[in-house]
Amino acid sequence: MGSHEVELRPWQSLAAGLGFSSPDEEYWWTAFAQPLNQLMEWADYSIAEQYRVLAFLHRYVIPTCGPKPYRNGEQYWKTFMGFDHTPIQVSINFYNSKATVRTANIPICALSGSALDPINQKATADTLKAQKHLAPGNDLRWFEHFAKAFFLPNDEAHLINAKVSDRVLAMQGVQGMLSYDFPPNRTQTKVAMSPIWKHIETGRPIGDLMIQSIKDLGDEATGYMQSLQVLEEFIESEAAKDAGVSPAFFAFDTNLSENYKSSRIKIYLATPRTAFNRMVDIFTLGGRLNGPEMDRATQALRLLWSSVINVPEGLLDNDDIVPKNPHRCACVIFNFEIWPGASVPTPKIYLPAAYYGKPDLEIAEGMDVFFKSQGWNQPFHSYTDNYAKAFLRDQKVTCRHHDISFSYKGEGAYVTAYYKPELDAFADAATWVPEIYK
């Protein structure tokens, strides 16, 4: 390469070679592919893997991001994913000696919000159908089942939407969010749904709707019933009421391989409570999950909690924390994985860094403290150095911590950092113009 030539990174090279069908797609590529590329470099993905993942993003994800923001930065379709309604997210998972990059987005199209798609249902269905051929085992039976249960005809959706004055609630009524994990040479797809619109239509509790829809899978759900029953008992318990627990949404794999033996269902609970003891109550399902592994998990959770959350000095374990960013979505989220044949669910907690966390670089330092406590020492475990290299530009953070999730599997912690790209750091809607699509 000549000294005057500039070496393109994979996200730039793919853009130059593949182009875009609209300025909107080029905008979202600029805002989405850059941080994803940086995250893959952090996770030590090979160049070939970086191209594979970015090619998937270009073909299947970018066209579903919808119109770019208005010039004032306001989103075309406002979602619950972040306090500023950014509909995209990148994340990196750490487990033992592996780092895995993931993405999530709420599919949106130009018809979202119109009479032809009042509550944004079309883009999710279209995206999954387009991806159906991707891999053996990629199966839409469950999506079709749950869509039948919770999607509304457009005429009904239009009437119900017009009656909802609480627009924050409407934004939380996500009919479909898609997330992708990118382990070596594979793509794993997960669909998340919230039956809020069906709840508004019928008046039935959200938790009842979710659990009944899982039971309605019939024989395919038989292996999940034991874990589901444990979760149901907790949701209906006084401990759950005391902790302010509300069922929020659920998710499921579309990779229904091995006759469903490798497929998860996740049920998400939310609470506005932030006292550490309440977190433990929910994480352990009121003590239903117990034993030496759970003891190790709660000890590790305490360290991670204090490492990334801005806990006031002297705060007692029964005291709640006041959010730095007061917002209806400033909740602590939990999910409980249920697997076929498992006797109890597997818990995960999402620490809400965007609302209760320390400044981003202090969170990074806290992650280093936690990683060292786990004995993690791979190059990608140098969290502060890697975070600064990936997401610090001219002393400004370009991707903010939104959540830090924690679970415990076997002998070790399972931790994921979720980031909200600062869109104006990559493509400021007020000044951005396409370079490739002209």
UniProtKB/Swiss-Prot annotation:
Pathway: Secondary metabolite biosynthesis. CDD domains: PT-DMATS_CymD (cd13929). The gene is janD. GO terms for biological process: alkaloid metabolic process. Belongs to the tryptophan dimethylallyltransferase family. This is Indole diterpene prenyltransferase janD. Keywords: Transferase. Disruption phenotype: Abolishes the production of the janthitremanes shearinine A, F or K but accumulates 13-desoxypaxilline. It comes from Penicillium janthinellum. It holds the Pfam family Trp_DMAT. Substrate binds at residues 102, 190, 264, 266, 268, 350, 414, 418. L-tryptophan binds at residues 80-81. It is an enzyme of class 2 (transferase). GO terms for molecular function: transferase activity, transferring alkyl or aryl (other than methyl) groups. PANTHER family: INDOLE PRENYLTRANSFERASE TDIB-RELATED, PRENYLTRANSFERASE ASQH1-RELATED. Its EC number is 2.5.1.-. Indole diterpene prenyltransferase; part of the gene cluster that mediates the biosynthesis of the indole diterpenes janthitremanes such as shearinine K or shearinine A. The geranylgeranyl diphosphate (GGPP) synthase janG catalyzes the first step in janthitremane biosynthesis via conversion of farnesyl pyrophosphate and isopentyl pyrophosphate into geranylgeranyl pyrophosphate (GGPP). Condensation of indole-3-glycerol phosphate with GGPP by the prenyl transferase janC then forms 3-geranylgeranylindole (3-GGI). InterPro entries: Aro_prenylTrfase_DMATS, DMATS-type_fun.
